[in-house]
Amino acid sequence: KWYTKAAEQECPEAQYELGVCYEAGDGVGKDEAKAAGLYRKAAVQGYAEAQKKLGDCYTHGTGVAKDLEQAFECYSKAAKQGNVKAQYNLGLCYMKGNGVTKDLVQAVEWYERAAEQGLAEAQYYLGRCYNNGEGVEKDPKKAAMWCEKAAEQGIAVAQYYLGCCYEDGKGVTKDLARAAEWYRKAAESGNVKAQFALGKCYYDGNGTEMNYSEAVKWYRKAAEQGDADAQNSLGYYYERGEGVAKDLGKAIEWYRKSADNGNELAQCNLGLCYECGKGVTKDLVKAAEWYQKAAEQGSAEAQNRLGECYFYGRGEPENKSAAVKWYEKAAEQGIANAQYNLGYCYEKGYGVTKDKEQAMQWYKKAADQGHESAKEAIDGMESGGMGAAVAGGVALAATGLIWKILRI
C-alpha cells in the first residue's frame, strides 16, 4: 500500500521495491510485466538497483521481450554507479559477447571491480580469467587467491577449483589434505566434479584415508547426477566388488549408462564384457560395436581390440588391412600389445607389405615396455629362426582373452 502511494509520487526507491513485490508475487498478484515497468520508471530516474533489475529482465525475458543489448545498457549504467552485481553482470556481457562486442580485457576490469567489493561470483570468474589467461596474463597464484576468496564464501565451483590447485600444486603449495578438504566442501554442496574428485581421493588414499566404501559413496552421488566418468568408475567397483558387493549386472548397468553418455573407457569396458561374456551373454558383434565407438574417440586400448576383431574376424569381417590401421593408431599411443601386433603384421605381411625393419622397430618398442612375446620375436628374428612366428601365434591368441578393466 505504502510502496504504491510512494511509487505514484515517482519515488524511485518505492517504484523499485514495488517492482520486486510484483515480480515475486509478494503481497500482490504476480505480474512480471508490471514489475518491469516499475523498474523502468525507477531506472529512468537513475536508481542503480532498478537499472540492474531491468537489465536482468531484458537478459531473461522477464516481463519484457528478451533484449541483450538493452540488458547491457542497463547493466552499464548501474555498474558505473558502483552497483556490484551490475559490475559482475557487465563482466559477463563482455566475456560472452552478450549485447556488446566480446572483450575479455573489459570483462576482467569489471570482474575486478566487483571482486574487490567482495562479490563471490566475480571473485571466482576473475580467478578463472587468471587461470586461463583470458583478458590477462596467466597467473596461477592470482587465480588461486581469487578462487580461495570465492571458495570461502561458499561458491562450490570455486571450492572444487581450489581443491584442484592444492592437488596439483598450482599457484599454491601442493597439499593433498587441503585438496580433499576443499573437494569435500564442494561435494557436499552438490558439485559433481568435486564428488568424483573426492571419491578418487578415498580410492587412492590421497589426502585422506583409503576407504573404498566412501569412494563408492561419492562416485555414486556423481554418477546419479549423470557424470560419465563416475558412472564408469562405479561400474568398475561393482565388477571388482570394491566398496560394494560384487554385482556384474550392476557393473554392466553403470558401464552402459556411461558408454551411452559417450565415455570412451566405459565403451571399451562394455566391449570387453561382451567379448568375454562377463555380466552379459557373449556377443562378439556387440563387442566390436563398442570397441568401434571407443576407438573412434581415441581410446588406445579399444583401437587395439578393434584391430584384433578385424584380424581374426571376431564380430567384424576378417580384414587384415583394417586390423593394421587400428593397431597402428593404438601402437602410436604406446600400447605394447598393439606395438607387438603391428610388428607381427609387418614381419608376416598381414595387411601390409612385409618389412623386417618395421617389424623389428615395433617389436623393440613393445619389448622396451616389458612385452615378453616381443622379446621372443626379436630373438627369433635375430637368430633367423621361427621364434617370432611361434610367439606371434600364441601372443595374438592370448591378447584377445585378456580381461583388462579400465577406469578413470
Give residue spans per PLM region.
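Short hydrophobic alpha-helical membrane-entry/anchor segments
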Residues: 386, 398-408
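TPR/TPR-like (Sel1-like) alpha-helical repeat modules
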Residues: 39-42, 183, 219, 353-372, ...
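TPR/TPR-like alpha-solenoid repeats
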Residues: 6, 21, 42, 57, ...
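Hydrophobic face of amphipathic alpha-helices that form TPR/SEL1-like repeat modules
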Residues: 17-24, 53-60, 89-96, 125-132, ...
